[in-house]
C-alpha cells in the first residue's frame, strides 16, 4: 500500500475525530467543560421529558417543592436546603415537569463542574475530559440525579466542600477555612448524612503526613467554628420544634436485628463497588498497556490525592459501621455523591498521558449512548403507560384535574387545603390553584381530623385505591365531619392514542363554610 492510499484510508477516521479534538483543545481555553455540560443538560432534559410523558414528577421532587412553600429552617423529615432551592427555582420557572427536570440536570451539571474544579489542580485538558466522561458512566449524574431530593442536592455540595477543605489544608488560609466550614454546613443542611463527609475531612487530616502543620494552624478551628455558627439557626429550630436530627431516619430505617443491619451494611459496600465498576473498568482498559507505571504512580500519590482518597475511604467505611451499631439499614444510593473521589483519584494518579485517540473514542461512545437513550425514551414512555409506576406517578396530574372539576361543581371558591399521602401532595403541585398540603400526621390535626379553621376554608383528601391506611383515614373523617362528601372516580392515562391502565381514586371534600 502506498503512502497516499494509507492517508486516504485514515482520513475518514480523522474527520469524525475532528469535532472531539476541537472540544478537547477547548478545555484548556476554558469553554470545553461548560460546553459539554450544556449539551449534557439539554440532552438529558429531553430524555427525561419524553421518557416520563406517561409519568409525572417523582414524589421526592414534589416533596421538595411542597416543603419549600413555607420558609423554615427544617421539617419533620428533612433539613431545609433542598426545599429552599426548589422554592427559589419555582420563582424563576413555571411549575411544570420540564422545569423540574431542568433543575435536576442543572444541579447534576454543577456537581460535575465542581469535580472538575478539583481535577484541574492535578491534570490538564485531556485527562479532565477523561474524568468527566468516566463520571458520566456512573449511574449517578443522570438516573440518581433526575429526582431532585435530599440526596441529589449533595451532588455539587460534596465536591465543593471537598475543594474548600483541600485548599484549606494545603494553604491554611482563613478564607478557604471559612469556605470549608460554610459549604460543609450547607451540605449538612442538605442531608444529615453529610456528617460522614466532615468525619472524612477530620480523619483524612489526622492520617496525613502534614497533619501537625495543619492542626497547629488556625484553619481547622476556623472551619469548625464557622460551620457550627452556620448551623445555629437550624439547631435552634430543632430545639424549639422538638424534631430531632435523626428521628425520621431511625423511624424509617432503624430498629432492625443486628444480622439484618450487618447484611444491609454488606449490601451497601457491594452496591458501591458495583456502581464504581464500569468507569473503573473502562479506565483499566485505557491504562492497561502501562499498568506497571500506573501501579508505581498509585504507590507514590501526590499529597493532595492521598488526602482525597482518604476522605473517600472514610465516607464508604464509616456509614456501614454506624449502621451496624445503630441497628438500622442503609442503601448505596446515599453514598452516590461521594463516589467521584475514587474516579478522580484513579484518573489523576497517572503521571503518563492517555492517548487522545482513546479519549476521542470514549467521547464518541458516551455521546452515542446518550443519543441512544434519547431514541429509546419513547419506549420507556410506552412501557410506563401500560405498567404504571408503583408510586402512582401515572395518575397525579389526571387525579388533580378531575378533583378540581368535582370541587368546582360544589364550590366557586378555590380549594384551600388538601391532605393525604403521596397523591394528595402531588395534587398541590398539579392543581392549577395549588392548594396547601398538610399531612395527616401534622401536629395541628386532632385524632387525624383537620382543624376547624382548615375545614371552614375548604378542604379535600384524596387516596389511590391501594393506599389502605389513607382510605381508612378518609372513611373515619367522613363519619365525624359534617358536610363531608365522599367521591370515587376513575382516571386513565393516554399516550399517543394508547389507553393506559386505569386507577380508582377515592376523595373526600368539605366545601368552605358559606
Q: Where do the model's predicted regions map?
A:
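Transmembrane-helix motifs of polytopic, lipid-linked glycan transferases
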Residues: 102-123, 160, 164
Amino acid at each position: 500500500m502506498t503512502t497516499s492510499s494509507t492517508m486516504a484510508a485514515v482520513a475518514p477516521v480523522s474527520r469524525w475525530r475532528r469535532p472531539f479534538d476541537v472540544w478537547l483543545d477547548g478545555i484548556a481555553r476554558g469553554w470545553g467543560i461548560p460546553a459539554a455540560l450544556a449539551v449534557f443538560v439539554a440532552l438529558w432534559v429531553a430524555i427525561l421529558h419524553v421518557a416520563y410523558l406517561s409519568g409525572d414528577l417523582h414524589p421526592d421532587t414534589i416533596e421538595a417543592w411542597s416543603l419549600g412553600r413555607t420558609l423554615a429552617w427544617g421539617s419533620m423529615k428533612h433539613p431545609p436546603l433542598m426545599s429552599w432551592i426548589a422554592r427559589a427555582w419555582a420563582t424563576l420557572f413555571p411549575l411544570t415537569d420540564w422545569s423540574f427536570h431542568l433543575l435536576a440536570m442543572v444541579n447534576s451539571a454543577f456537581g460535575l463542574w465542581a469535580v472538575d474544579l478539583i481535577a484541574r489542580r492535578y491534570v490538564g485538558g485531556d485527562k479532565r475530559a477523561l474524568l468527566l466522561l468516566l463520571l458520566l458512566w456512573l449511574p449517578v449524574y443522570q438516573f440518581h440525579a433526575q429526582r431532585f431530593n435530599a440526596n441529589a442536592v449533595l451532588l455539587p455540595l460534596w465536591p465543593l466542600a471537598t475543594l474548600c477543605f483541600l485548599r484549606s489544608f494545603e494553604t491554611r488560609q482563613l478564607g478557604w477555612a471559612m469556605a470549608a466550614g460554610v459549604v460543609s454546613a450547607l451540605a449538612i443542611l442538605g442531608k444529615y448524612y453529610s456528617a460522614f463527609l466532615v468525619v472524612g475531612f477530620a480523619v483524612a487530616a489526622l492520617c496525613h503526613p502534614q497533619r501537625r502543620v495543619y492542626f497547629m494552624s488556625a484553619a481547622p478551628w476556623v472551619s469548625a467554628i464557622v460551620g457550627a455558627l452556620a448551623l445555629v439557626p437550624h439547631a435552634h429550630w430543632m430545639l424549639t420544634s422538638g424534631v430531632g436530627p435523626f428521628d425520621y431516619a431511625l423511624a424509617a430505617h432503624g430498629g432492625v436485628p443486628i444480622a439484618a443491619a450487618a447484611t444491609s451494611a454488606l449490601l451497601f459496600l457491594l452496591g458501591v463497588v458495583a456502581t464504581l465498576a464500569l468507569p473503573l473498568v473502562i479506565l483499566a482498559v485505557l491504562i492497561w498497556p502501562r499498568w506497571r507505571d500506573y501501579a508505581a504512580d498509585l504507590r507514590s500519590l501526590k499529597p493532595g490525592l492521598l488526602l482525597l482518597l482518604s476522605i473517600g475511604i472514610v465516607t464508604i467505611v464509616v456509614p456501614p459501621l454506624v449502621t451496624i451499631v445503630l441497628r438500622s439499614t442503609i442503601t448505596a444510593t446515599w453514598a452516590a455523591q461521594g463516589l467521584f473521589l475514587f474516579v478522580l483519584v484513579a484518573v489523576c494518579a497517572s503521571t503518563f498521558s492517555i492517548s487522545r485517540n482513546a479519549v476521542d473514542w470514549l467521547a464518541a461512545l458516551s455521546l452515542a449512548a446518550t443519543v441512544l437513550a434519547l431514541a429509546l425514551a419513547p419506549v420507556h414512555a410506552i412501557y410506563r403507560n401500560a405498567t404504571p409506576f408503583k408510586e402512582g406517578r401515572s395518575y397525579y396530574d389526571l387525579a388533580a384535574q378531575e378533583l378540581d372539576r368535582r370541587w368546582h361543581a360544589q364550590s366557586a371558591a378555590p380549594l384551600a387545603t388538601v391532605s393525604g399521602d403521596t397523591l394528595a401532595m402531588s395534587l398541590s403541585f398539579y392543581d392549577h390553584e395549588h392548594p396547601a398540603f398538610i399531612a395527616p400526621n401534622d401536629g395541628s390535626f386532632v385524632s387525624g381530623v383537620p382543624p376547624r379553621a382548615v375545614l371552614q376554608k375548604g378542604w379535600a383528601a384524596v387516596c389511590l385505591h391501594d393506599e389502605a391506611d389513607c382510605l381508612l383515614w378518609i372513611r373515619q373523617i367522613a363519619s365525624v365531619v359534617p358536610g363531608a362528601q365522599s367521591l370515587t372516580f376513575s382516571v386513565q392515562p393516554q399516550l399517543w392514542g394508547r389507553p393506559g391502565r386505569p386507577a380508582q381514586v377515592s376523595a373526600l371534600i368539605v366545601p368552605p363554610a358559606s
